[in-house]
């Protein structure tokens, strides 16, 4: 007769969940000093859960919590189809935004997992968390044995590298815990060395304010030092994953809903500037990269056009510089125009 843990492991495999692990719902108190230090240093993004105690104490999310079930689903990092060539230059979304928004996919998986467990074990108390939940997902996953926290701050496993999305069920079930893995980064510092903004601190933490992924998600004017560094990426950044040796040769295609549509993940840049809010939502709204709305994306498109040396964009950029009511778009257009025409700006830049 299979144990409850074995039954849940089989259920997870049947649900196409690539990694599952179990850890006690004990506090993550060892993170407290580091999280406080990061906030005081100005290294946080502002997207983190606000209540520090809730980030560290699972029982504040579920009073009778005993076991946390951590899951990872692997996603593709190489597209099987390329976008067709057109008259327009294309940009790109990072791989974490390919296909359907991973928050939706993970929530469905956790719901299916919880419903399956109920059929096995009867009613139980649980709360599901994905990305924006209270707990630190990578810390939960590492303690549950899914992998280790790399120097890039991401969860890394031998089977799937860091190309995994994480979520967890905090439950009142009593299940034997798994042990952390016995491998790690060793002396490798490739992610730290290749980060173009030196955002990685080298110990698994980062200065989120310097991370290009964060910068592409901000609203308003992007500081000038990051504009050329994003190249033609209009959302996110994958550099610290692409250079990781654990990711070499890995490309997972388990979930059809996460396969990229090349016209969305590598969109034509210039036409994107003419999309209304509704048109943007209709076209890109199912992607994780759309969560901040069209404005940051359109700003990034302007930077990308400048970086791509796309002089065909100059009429549109001049129109934005002269007529757009959004100050950050005017600023971006003037920057791109100067880059393309090598002229002085019309007015001082905001920094």
UniProtKB/Swiss-Prot annotation:
UniProt KW keywords: 4Fe-4S, Cytoplasm, Iron, Iron-sulfur, Metal-binding, Oxidoreductase, Queuosine biosynthesis, tRNA processing
Entry protein name: Epoxyqueuosine reductase
Keyword Signal: no
Annotated cofactor note: Binds 2 [4Fe-4S] clusters per monomer.
Catalytic activity line of the entry: epoxyqueuosine(34) in tRNA + AH2 = queuosine(34) in tRNA + A + H2O
Gene: queG
Active-site residues, record numbering mapped to chain: 131 (proton donor)
Pathway note: tRNA modification; tRNA-queuosine biosynthesis
Molecular function, one GO term: epoxyqueuosine reductase activity
Residues that hold [4Fe-4S] cluster 1 according to the record: 185, 188, 191, 244
GO-annotated biological processes: queuosine biosynthetic process; tRNA modification
């Amino acid at each position: 007769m299979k144990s409850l843990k074995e039954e849940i492991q089989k259920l997870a495999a049947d649900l196409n969940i690539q990694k599952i692990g179990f850890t006690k719902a004990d506090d993550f108190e060892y993170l407290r000093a580091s999280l406080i230090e990061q906030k005081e240093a100005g290294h946080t993004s502002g997207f983190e859960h606000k209540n520090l105690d809730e980030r560290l104490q699972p029982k504040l999310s579920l009073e009778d919590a005993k076991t946390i079930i951590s899951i990872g689903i692997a996603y593709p990092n190489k597209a099987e189809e390329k976008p067709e060539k057109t008259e327009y230059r294309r940009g790109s979304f990072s791989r974490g935004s390919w296909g359907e928004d991973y928050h939706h996919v993970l929530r469905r998986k956790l719901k299916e997992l919880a419903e399956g467990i109920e059929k096995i074990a009867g009613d139980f108390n649980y709360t599901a968390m994905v990305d924006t939940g209270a707990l630190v997902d990578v810390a939960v996953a590492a303690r549950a044995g899914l992998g280790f926290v790399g120097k890039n701050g991401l969860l890394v496993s031998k089977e799937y590298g860091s190309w995994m999305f994480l979520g967890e069920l905090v439950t009142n079930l009593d299940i034997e815990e798994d042990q952390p893995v016995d491998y790690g980064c060793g002396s490798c510092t490739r992610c730290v060395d290749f980060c173009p903004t030196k955002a990685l601190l080298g110990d698994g933490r980062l200065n989120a304010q310097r991370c290009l992924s964060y910068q592409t998600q901000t609203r308003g004017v992007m500081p000038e030092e990051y504009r050329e560094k994003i190249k033609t990426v209009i959302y996110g950044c994958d550099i610290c994953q692409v250079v990781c040796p654990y990711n070499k040769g890995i490309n997972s295609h388990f979930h059809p809903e996460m396969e990229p549509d090349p016209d969305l993940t590598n969109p034509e840049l210039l036409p994107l500037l003419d999309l209304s809010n509704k048109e943007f939502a209709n076209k890109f709204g199912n992607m994780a990269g759309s969560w901040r709305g069209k404005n940051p994306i359109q700003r990034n498109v302007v930077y990308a056009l400048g970086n791509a040396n796309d002089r065909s964009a100059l009429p549109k950029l001049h129109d934005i510089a002269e007529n757009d009511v959004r100050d950050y778009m005017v600023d971006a257009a003037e920057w791109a125009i100067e880059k393309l025409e090598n002229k002085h700006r019309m007015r001082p830049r905001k920094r």
